[in-house]
Amino acid sequence: MCFLPFCTIFVFFALANHNIIQMKKLLFLVLFVATAMMGQAQVSKMLGQWNTFDDKTGDMRSTVNIYEENGTYQCVITTLYEKDANGKFQVMKAPYPKGFEGVVGTQLFSEMKVDGDQLKGRVYDPESQKTYYGKVTYKEKTDELILRGSLDKAGLLGRSQTWKRKK
């Protein structure tokens, strides 16, 4: 993102008006808009298909699709995986084994909204069939999502999973 237009406006305003209070107000506005735009850019990188992994075993569990709809972010399970005889992951096909029926198509996010450079809302755990407070953070260096589900809003009592972008 280029901040040159913002800086140019600020310098022009500062030279045209030597009023310090107005310059401070403009600087605050420029920084506020720039921060909001950077957070939105981070969140847009979360959209798309992601492979999920069991936080205890590290095994690939599913592919999910994250998308924006009516100002909130949704996440639906699109594919389940299982290990074959050689230990490689393959797509689990219907009819699904007991306990996996109805999992494909399950919505994992509810009330997920942008909060800075994260998504915050509620996350559903199909395994426990419970809903928790949820937070999603994008790690740009590794192109991964960190999903934190917790009993408390602060995220102290819970667990995290790392999701990797589907290639």
Model feature map: region roles:
Residues E144, L151-K167:
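Edge beta-strand at a domain terminus
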Residues H18-L26:
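Positively charged n-region of N-terminal signal peptides that target proteins for export
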Residues G134-K135, E140-L147, S160:
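Short, compact, well-ordered microdomains
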Residues M38-Q49:
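N-terminal helix-cap/turn-to-beta initiation motif at the start of protein domains
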Residues V11-A16:
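Acidic, Ala/Val/Gly-enriched low-complexity intrinsically disordered segments
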Residues T52-D54, D59-E127, T131-Y133:
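Central antiparallel beta-sheet cores of small beta-barrel/beta-sandwich binding domains
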Residues L26-T35:
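Sec-dependent N-terminal signal peptides
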